[in-house]
Amino acid sequence: MEANKIIITGGATRIGASIARKLSGPGVELVIHFNKSKRKAERLKKELLKNKTRVYLVKGDLSKENEVNKILKFAKSKLKYFDCLINNASLFENDKLENFTTDSWGKHLRTNLRTPALLSKEFAKNIKGKNNNIINIIDQRIFKLTPFFFSYTISKTGLYTLTKTSAMSLAPKVRVNGIAPGPTIKNKRQSEKHFKKQFMATPLKRQVNVSEICNAVEFFINNKSITGQVLAIDSGQNLNWQTPDITGGKE
């Protein structure tokens, strides 16, 4: 696999940690960003060191530009140059048009859209060769819009657009693609019952395995003829005409 100088935001837990494991190995250097998950980040680092991966941990609040700049400075000092950026971290809070606040709106847009844009800009300035990749972790809801999770959805549809436009801007040296996951890992708002209801309501009636998302990341890195694409890995959830948030389930 042609990715050895890698930055992963939100890489200490959940999907981000699984991607870090997938991309790790001898000769690989990983900068793993975290915010509140220091212990999990340290455990992951210890795990990855066993397979001869060089791991560098960096803490930062992605809603604050000065902290994003510190992350970039740290990554440059450790890796010297980059060949893969995984914009995985995101803020996911529920609001609607009727009750959103400027604080919630701002945090979602800064964390989920502005920061990936800033990281992408600096990534493109610090590359070598022509096989460089940015992979944005988005959300299947960009293909199946609802009025729920208003600020989050706006930020993720923006990230979808960023994926497309940056693929145009950064070609041919950087390929930019995205993954739009469906029900993969239960979130803090959901009970096991509600999560099962969510994935059983998909056409394929199955939970997305995180390994399938990791395989897609590897596929995008290895396939040099793909850019500007967003792949839904969601058991067909974006095809539903009635989604759990409409029928009374929790997301």
Question: Where are the model-predicted features located?
Answer:
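Conserved NAD(P)H cofactor-binding loop of Rossmann-fold oxidoreductase domains
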Residues: 88-93, 236
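Short C-terminal tail/terminal secondary-structure segment
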Residues: 144, 227-251
